[in-house]
């Protein structure tokens, strides 16, 4: 260690301006330390004689010896990082309070080096290291500031330390140093602020400390690292609803700057800017503002990127933006449909597929014009190809999209002609209740008020026992929601007034018995329910008077009673067709 050794060599160099004599034990420590430093790979400086020699110099009254100890600690810790004891940290923390700036620079560096190790991070904070580090951040010396902030940055990567740091008073000086004209100080400060954004409590502390205006202003920095730290910090801050409200009121230029950063030459800045917009777009006002700020052209380019992180960030962002009905047509007009359909084949990421399907689902519920383009994009055929083989999460989104599309009388015929029943019927057998429920609802919606029953009859018995099999399974499920879907579907089939359908249902004993079983199971509850209402009488033969206009009991009915009555009500309407 050239610098340290030079500080130790020579009698004259050991004298300081005070003219204090060097004690014998200090002279011996210098001699020993010179030997240790010349052969440092052979010694452990964190215990035994090397540590005692360093400690002796730290507690010397001789300024040069103190400097030598600080410089030695800085070099040793840079090369050798391992868990250390209190005996190592105590002299370094002592040096942090030294009035000499060179000593504070070196001791901050040493502490920052040791703070790479997780055990050391905890011990430094436990031993009260934050207070002297905060004082060093307030120094007028840029090097002291830089090393102190660098140490805080390392300490803040340990979760257990973050609350301590947030409550120590460190956030205000960190925020101030984020405006430093020195780029190294600025990088360290913004990096430390970023490390403090990984929990809701700490994010609130940051907002309260006034960090948001600083972070937003630094989005315009020419330094890619500073841009990245600030963009990521703001993205994390935007996770919380209360913070989004704060940003909406106090950061009016935020969206414009983030949209601009989607064109950054730095891939990670571009990605984080998109993620920040995604988080902001959890709120309705931001969904509109991002579009007004010109975000769609950039997003449609990014979802076609070769970078998986960029594709994921951008498709997640457009998914949130597509939630707002006023954005649906603009998204379609911006050319999103073809690349979104292409993303359905993105086998490398289930999450990307999910966001793509979810976005398409939102767009499917828009205007007739957009719905026409939706069908022309080939998305239905792609859904059919994926539906039975894709991951559960993707299948769930596809089933939800089919359920929404099937609600529209204008799209039912197209869906039936594209043979969606071929995949919807097997999906009703899924062990996932959301998938089976959505798929069954889609089948029921397709059947409701349909004039051409050709496809209904074609898929009555196949695949997987067809529509008939789905109805039998749901009638015997003992799950009220499934029973309701099956009963409602049967009622819709009867209301088509098709003799072939009548015959298929009436002659199938499993279907008939399933309906009667549900009627029997819910008769007692329904009768009590109606007696409480006093307006309607029901007999067990299925005759009812003014069922839809029944009175309600003054006491609140339970959800279970409501469900039982509704099930019984539908069974009675079906039984009228069966008799």
Swiss-Prot record:
Keywords assigned: Lipoprotein, Membrane, Myristate, Palmitate, Repeat, Vacuole
Subcellular location as annotated: Vacuole membrane
Lineage: Eukaryota, Fungi, Dikarya, Ascomycota, Saccharomycotina
Biased composition (Polar residues): 534-556
Main function: Functions in both vacuole inheritance and protein targeting from the cytoplasm to vacuole.
This protein's record includes keyword NAD: no
ARM repeat windows: 39-76, 77-116, 118-157, 159-198, 200-239, 241-282, 284-323, 325-365, 409-448
Protein name as it appears in the record: Vacuolar protein 8
GO cellular component, one term: fungal-type vacuole membrane
Membrane topology listed for this record: Lipid-anchor
GO MF annotation, one: protein-membrane adaptor activity
């Amino acid at each position: 260690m050239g610098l340290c050794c030079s500080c130790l060599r020579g009698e004259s160099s050991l004298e300081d301006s005070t003219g204090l004599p060097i004690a014998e034990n200090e002279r011996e420590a210098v001699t020993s330390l010179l030997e240790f430093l010349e052969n440092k790979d052979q010694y452990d400086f964190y215990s035994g004689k090397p540590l005692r020699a360093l400690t002796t110099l730290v507690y010397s009254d001789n300024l040069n010896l103190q400097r030598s100890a600080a410089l030695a600690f800085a070099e040793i810790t840079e090369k050798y990082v391992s868990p250390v004891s209190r005996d190592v940290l105590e002299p370094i923390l002592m040096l942090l309070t030294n009035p000499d700036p060179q000593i504070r620079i070196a001791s901050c560096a040493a502490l920052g080096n040791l703070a790479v190790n997780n055990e050391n991070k905890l011990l430094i904070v436990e031993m009260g290291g934050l207070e002297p580090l905060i004082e060093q951040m307030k120094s007028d010396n840029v090097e002291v500031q830089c090393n102190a902030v660098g140490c805080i940055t390392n300490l803040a990567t340990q979760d257990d330390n973050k609350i301590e740091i947030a409550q120590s008073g460190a956030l205000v000086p960190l925020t101030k140093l984020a405006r430093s004209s020195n780029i190294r100080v600025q990088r360290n400060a913004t990096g430390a602020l970023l490390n403090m954004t990984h929990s809701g409590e700490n994010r609130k502390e940051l907002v309260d400390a006034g960090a948001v205006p600083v972070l937003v202003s630094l989005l315009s920095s020419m330094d890619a690292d500073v841009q990245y730290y600030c963009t990521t910090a703001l993205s994390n801050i935007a996770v919380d609803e209360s913070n989004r409200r704060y940003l909406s009121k106090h950061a009016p230029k935020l969206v414009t700057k983030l949209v601009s950063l989607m064109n950054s030459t730095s891939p990670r800045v571009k990605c984080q800017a998109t993620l920040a917009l995604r988080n902001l777009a959890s709120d309705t006002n931001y969904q509109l503002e991002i579009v007004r700020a010109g975000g769609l052209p950039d997003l449609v380019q990014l979802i076609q990127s070769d970078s998986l992180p960029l594709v994921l960030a951008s498709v997640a962002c457009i998914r949130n933006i597509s939630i707002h009905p006023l954005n649906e047509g603009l998204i379609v007009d911006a050319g999103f449909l073809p690349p979104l359909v292409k993303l359905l084949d993105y086998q490398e990421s289930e999450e990307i597929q999910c966001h793509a399907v979810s976005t398409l689902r939102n767009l499917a519920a828009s205007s007739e014009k957009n719905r026409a383009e939706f069908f022309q994009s080939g998305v239905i055929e792609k859904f059919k190809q994926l539906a039975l083989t894709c991951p559960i999460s993707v299948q769930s989104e596809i089933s939800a999209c089919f359920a929404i599309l099937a609600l529209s009388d204008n799209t039912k015929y197209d869906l039936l002609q594209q043979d969606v029943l071929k995949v919807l019927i097997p999906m009703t057998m899924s062990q996932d209740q959301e998938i089976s429920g959505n798929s069954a609802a889609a089948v029921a919606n397709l059947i409701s008020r349909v004039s051409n029953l050709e496809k209904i009859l074609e898929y009555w018995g196949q695949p997987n026992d067809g529509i008939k099999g789905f109805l039998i399974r749901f009638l015997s499920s003992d799950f009220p929601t499934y029973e309701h879907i099956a009963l409602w579907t049967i009622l819709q089939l009867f209301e088509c007034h098709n003799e072939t359908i009548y015959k298929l249902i009436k002659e199938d004993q499993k279907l008939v018995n399933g309906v009667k079983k549900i009627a029997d199971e819910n008769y007692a509850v329904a009768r009590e329910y109606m007696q409480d209402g006093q307006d309607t009488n029901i007999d067990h033969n299925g005759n009812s008077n003014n069922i839809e206009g029944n009175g309600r009991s003054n006491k609140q009915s339970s959800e279970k009673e409501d469900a039982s009555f509704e099930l019984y009500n539908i069974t009675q309407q079906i039984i009228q067709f069966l008799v």
